[in-house]
Amino acid sequence: MKFLFSTINLRRMLKIGILALFVLLNILNLPAGWADNGDYNRITQWFSSGPAFLPENFPPAGTPAWDRRFYSEWVPFWKLDFPLASGMFNSALLLWAPGILINKLLYSGSVLWAPLASLGVRLVLLALLWRLLNGLEHGPRPVLHMLTLALPLVLLFGTRDVAAFYNSFYQEAGTLVFLPLLLLVVGWGCTRPRDAWFYAAYAAAVLLLVTSKTAAFYWAPLALAFVLPLHKVLRQPRIYLPLAVGLVAVPLAAGLMLTHVPNIGPNRAYNALFGGVLQLSEAPQQRLTELGLAQSERCLALDWYNGGADCSRPDWDKISYSAVVRVLLAEPQIVLKQAQFMADRSQNLSLSFGQYAFGDDYPRRADRLNLWSRLKANIFPRGGWLAVSLLLLGAGIAATWKQPGLAGSLARVGLLCLLALVIDGYVEILGDGQRDLLKHLFIPNVLFDLALLAVFNALLARGAAAFGRKTPG
């Protein structure tokens, strides 16, 4: 009896300690956020017309004012004037709304402090962590999996390079919340009847994730296979076929329509063509000639925002994603080169942007708060070894797929993350080329970590069950 009570107390203490650590890391990381690369303006125009204490929102390129506004320094204070001028919607707005309201009521009616706007992001992540801990607490080997699953997740989502997104008005802020939400729902569906409540929760989770950014569209068809197997649809098509179509079509249409950036012109297609496939082509001049762009060879060295737009202006009508496809059909080996290119640059959560406000000496004391990011950069596999590790993760999934309970659930979550990281990487590099590649590979990097933790814990759960190892709890 005494052992039972001590075990229960250990579970509760560990649970409270893990929650407290996540809260502490978030508090300590409040002074950090990622500098704006120009994407802020797409979303912030709903509630802010620009930085609060800088003279202009778009200073001339190359000036000290431009350098301070973009890329090099994080801007924590924004005008709170609600211009409502954005032409797109992002589900992260739902997370920022509570913090913006509290800011207006209790802090300032005219100046928005970005860390306060991030309150909703942090609270929802805390709630998801609490839900995960509750599930582990009432499952087999709770102490083991709290230490090997929940604690590493806190280190991942609390590391400075990830937490900086919470204070930034990037689309990834929403993805970092609604991705774990969807994974929790998928795991939950593996251990309970998939009734109307389950499908309602799944529909909400996938809708929020798909509307977090345009590149997340693939989650709608991908995740469905894990909650509504094909054999079930074929067995009862009158019931499940309309459900399957609705669970794919509605979030897919909403995501593509709401997150589309209006008036962007050939920007992304230019980056995908000149900054993407042509950079890996063995005969770029020949490909340009075939596309009727022979006179645009000099554009290969130019980013869209640094001369590329003017360079290619006479040929905008010829620059499209169909041109990207034509290059890939002419040189299909580019697909493998893209995979190698991404693999060589994997395992890096740090962007090439500034992370601190002007005059802040915080970086001198912040490395200790970036433990997971540094660990990942130094010891996680990249290049050819990344491919080997993906195969090993696949083997781990195969070994635990048919296991009941936690092991089987984690195997499914691991496979979902594994497939998503490959798809997401290609969507990003095909969609926007090599521009801001570290930022675009951020979500695939997080997905690798989630897959690794899921498969590792699935193997632990299977091993503990098979050999009858008794751990505390």
Would you name each region that the model predicts?
Residues 182-201:
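Membrane-interface transmembrane helices that cradle and orient dolichyl/undecaprenyl
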Residues 9-69, 248-260:
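Transmembrane signal-anchor helices characteristic of membrane glycosylation enzymes that use polyprenol
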Residues 68-109:
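Short hydrophobic/aromatic helix or loop-helix immediately within or flanking a transmembrane segment
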Residues 106-124, 342-417:
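Membrane-interface anchor segments at the N-terminal boundary of transmembrane helices
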Residues 198-214:
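Membrane-interface alpha helices of multi-pass inner-membrane proteins
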Residues 10-14, 194-199, 232-249:
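Membrane-interfacial entry segments at the cytosolic side of transmembrane helices
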Residues 47-81, 259-360:
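Membrane-proximal stem/loop segments at transmembrane-domain junctions that anchor or position
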Residues 116-143:
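Transmembrane-helix motifs of polytopic, lipid-linked glycan transferases
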